[in-house]
Amino acid sequence: MGGKMLRSVSELIYKVYARYLLGQINLNNLPGHVALIVDGNRRWARKEKRDRISDGHRAGAGKAVDFLHWCDELDINIVTLYLLSNDNLKNRNRQELNDLVQVICNLIAQVSKRWKVNHVGSCENLPELLGNSLEGVKSSTKTNRYSERSMTVNLAIGYSGRAEITEAVRKIVNTYPIGDLPEKITEEVISANLYTGGLSDPDLIIRTSGEQRLSDFMPWQSTHSEFYFLEALGPDLRKVDFLRAIRDFSIRRRSFGA
């Protein structure tokens, strides 16, 4: 009985604190585009003494879906989830990669039922199962069954920031005559040819696990982004952590390099 009472009190305090944080947020200065670098899944699995690393990836994916709901509640327009980098594809062992691909495929199916989904990355080196899942997302998005106010979710899968910029420049070089290139290679044209072409850059980038680096994530688009680093591992991310990040952003005065 004592344990149940303690849990009830703890849950009540948590709800009150979440409501307090929400009240501190300047709703007139919310980010239009939030990106989340989902990190720490493997460390979480080891910390929790799980038999399989995939348990950590599965828990992290579940928390990513929670994160999307939290963003949707605040009417944030665009959310980008960094799920699988090119380095992950090269460096993870086959079993872990196979498990991770299955987790991501399940996540894609779940997210695409509710929100508009874009793939941000290259399909070139992706496992066939994952590539097929992303192709299915393209088809479902074309049916235009989402409302105009539906949040857009970018899934960064098979992503590398350096590769993205390189590919954008190649597109430009292959599009225009050589003599026109000096005038055509501008910031605006490069931005338009990135995976995220046509979308706004992230206003706020959140990273879990205590690491304070970008890990090749959107080096071009993050020039004027605000950053918020969390000690919590991906699966341990809480709504109050999210609300603190949004509160912090909402009261910052952004300089945009000035």
From Swiss-Prot:
TM stretches of this protein: none
Primary enzyme class: transferase
Pfam annotation, one family: Prenyltransf
Annotated binding of substrate, by residue: 40-44, 52, 57, 85-87, 92, 207, 213-215
PROSITE patterns attached to this UniProt entry: UPP_SYNTHASE (PS01066)
Residue numbers annotated as active site: D39, N88
EC number: 2.5.1.-
Residues annotated to bind Mg(2+): D39, E226
GO MF annotations, alphabetized: ditrans,polycis-polyprenyl diphosphate synthase [(2E,6E)-farnesyl diphosphate specific] activity; magnesium ion binding
CDD domains named among the record's database cross-references: Cis_IPPS
Biological role stated in the UniProt entry: Catalyzes the condensation of isopentenyl diphosphate (IPP) with allylic pyrophosphates generating different type of terpenoids.
Subunit structure: Homodimer.
NCBIfam families xref list: PRK14828.1 (NF011403), uppS (TIGR00055)
Name the UniProt record assigns to this protein: Isoprenyl transferase 1
Naturally occurring in which organism (per UniProt): Tropheryma whipplei (strain TW08/27)
